[in-house]
């Protein structure tokens, strides 16, 4: 009966909605041609012997030139779980710059530019995760245009519990006086650990100038230290509102 069919269709749609994702990113996913090609093909890289740079320090480093998805697929087979640190500088998908998706430039008028960018990043970050060692971490440069989307995407792939921090850095030496609204001087670096419970940063040692502020008059076993006040270093007369 037609009415019964319509009811069944409506119930099916309701069930789909109930089973749908409740929180996180939802976008129009689209496979690139390179994804389809690699279902039945394995990327092979050819060594350029004439471009080899020999050193006497030992160890072998190499530079892969080509589609980054091809490179990641290859590294997945040779370096899975072996890389301690990854830094990537993906396309920012800004309005004044285009990026290539599926061998075509995606311009600012493309209605699916954000979905294409997310699909682009999703496939690559899934592979990147497989490369990280247990103590590994990834640093990802981004600006405000896709920072919010990238954070949710990385939470989904690496796990929200493995988010380390978001570093803000000044990309401009001085504010832009010709900005229409606010001067956009900051970009970001998202930091995720493969397993935050075991990841530890490698801190830089203090230089001689920095060390002169630290002493160890009481022979503390933990090393030189510097005393500091836990409150504001202003007097009651200078900052009465703090007292």
PLM region spans:
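RNase H-like polynucleotidyl transferase catalytic core
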Residues: 164-176
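Conserved nucleotide-binding/hydrolysis micro-motifs of P-loop NTPases
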Residues: 91-94, 145-147, 171-174, 195-198
